[in-house]
Amino acid sequence: VLERCLERTLTRYAGEFVGIQEARALLYKMETHYAELVTEAVRVVSLQKIAEILRRLVSEGVPVRAMRTILEAIVAWGPQESSSARLSDRIRLAMARQISHRHARSDRVLPAWIATRPLEEALRTAQRNSENQPVRSGMPAPLSRALNGWFQQQLEALDSDLQPVVVAASDVRAALQQWLKQHDIDLPVMAWQEIAPEFSLQAIAQIRLPKPIPRRESEATAKL
């Protein structure tokens, strides 16, 4: 039990150990075989931004051993995506095979909890309403409570051998992942496009809101 708790803690905070020095070390190691690729990646995106991207990936449990794939995605999408968050999402798509492999069973099946369209729309509305607000206050209180209730109920009934992923639309994936992390729920969130072709999805539940959220309440954001 102690070993599992330690592993969860290290995984949860792993991103905090990735900075410019660590990014530079990874790039230096890559230069041995991919010097031109490293040079082009650093030309397109600053070292500071590369460090931020790696930090995002590590904090979401994405393996960064596939640095060639990461750098190729940076070269391809870096000129078009000024946001580190959006560029990180592009890199995740390029790493669909690695992400799927990390979370799938040995038979290449991904047990999953699927976000329903009403939930995704509620998350989009929350994102629009919180664009100019602090990140931690972006989730409306009723939506946060409803989500927390659903996840706690499902986790209590979940078979200990089952480790599901959460699947949601790409534009709300990061927000849902951040919310789960803030509430100490250690589940990876994948976008549909991140499921590699050779893997299959096993839907075991749909994430449904228990009842419509009153409009007046939904506008009051929770500082969670």
Residue ranges and their predicted role:
Residues 1-224:
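Membrane-embedded alpha-helical signal segments
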